[in-house]
């Protein structure tokens, strides 16, 4: 089971065991990556998009053999009293034969060794001749040095390298891709379930696809909730990156349009955002026709945080499981205001105390649900990025009972009928 983030996995962590299923491993996509790097850096949105793109996949393929080069001159190899000459043309031909193979790059290097070794034995007619030709072995190492995945990615990326590099999450997925190109397939599973699949980059989807060589994969997602910089906009692209296709029968796409979680009065308003998400998707309809339409509480900028705290107390009076979705810049003020009314802002959904209130930004709340949701400054979420309509859609559809807005400005006109 591959979830979008650690908070989500903690949220659903007890679901399968409660059903008697204890053999399923629950991971984030990042957990699947090998070999590991120490992730301490953070990319900006444009860099995340670039590093997660198919362009980077192509650049990695090119870089994986860029260090392989034929010698400048013919190679003379002394063996005992004799000297054998391997012409540059011969070496180049063997090199191209080895490179043309389909094995991982470091194993194709062994193919080059086999071609040269066979020719040397033909010339000298002795089985131990390879051991007596250290100059030849050194020359082959010079032509085709062994490359390690972390070093390959370090050389490919801009910025300070080596020990000075601050690796990021996107870099870790590139290292996993490099490992596949150089070393070969990683550990695998019999079946993989991927939730929130639309948020994964092209490079991350490749990482997930390799974990099921037989392409036994179930993916779930909503393109209208694709909120990451390198996320997906077409299911056909997702399938292709996983190594499957609906066109050739190796995959089947089922559109689920009946909702059981979000009440119709909330979902109908959220669906007004779909034309502005930039993706092709079908609006869902809820079987829960009863419910309350979203409510708006206006507040000045100066009173915004205090109004949020008051609204949370009001919603919690009937719905203890209440969460806040807000722009991250407002977190400190909201936390302080919650403290004033005797509540505590937390960034988790497990092991909650009676007075704890989860507070998240829209991207982090993906996959979670609350009986009551308080969305702060929806206009700021909507206008904050090109993904704003999708982020606001995510925020609104976390509510399974009531949705309240607290805002210093009117709701985005896109939410009006």
Language-model features: where?
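Alpha-helical nucleic-acid-binding subdomain
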Residues: 1-193, 198-207, 215, 224, ...
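Conserved helicase motor core of SF1/SF2 NTP-dependent helicases
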Residues: 4-48, 177-191, 198-417
